[in-house]
Amino acid sequence: MPKKFTYAEAGVDRKIRAESKKALALLKRTYKFSRYGRVVKLPYGNIFPFSRYLYLDLVIEGVGTKVLVAQLANKYDTIGIDGIALAVNDLIRSGAKPLAVADNIHAQVSDPALVKAWMKGVVEGATEAE
């Protein structure tokens, strides 16, 4: 049986993370800033009033420890596919439809081959989601 890999072994301290997330409560002060109404808090995120009868569900997806798996397999397109799949899954829970993908990549190294594989995965994931 393979060895279990934990968040702690990947360098993630879940207690500190939970403590840090408490600071997000400060954002509630901004929930009334829209002229169209208040931000609606859902169990997994928030939706934002975009016009009188429309809401925007904004998803920011991180790849987290998936990078470790991609490095071990030397296969990076799966990061893009998975990122899109997770973002779309978050969107459809509120009844939203995907609108766009931001092209913001946070990577330790700017390796053109890695970025190309990653973007191929993003395109494949978006195509599958369509």
Predicted regions and their residues:
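N-terminal amphipathic/basic leader segments beginning at the initiator methionine
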Residues: 2-36
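Glycine-rich phosphate/pyrophosphate-binding loop regions near the starts of catalytic domains
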Residues: 26-130
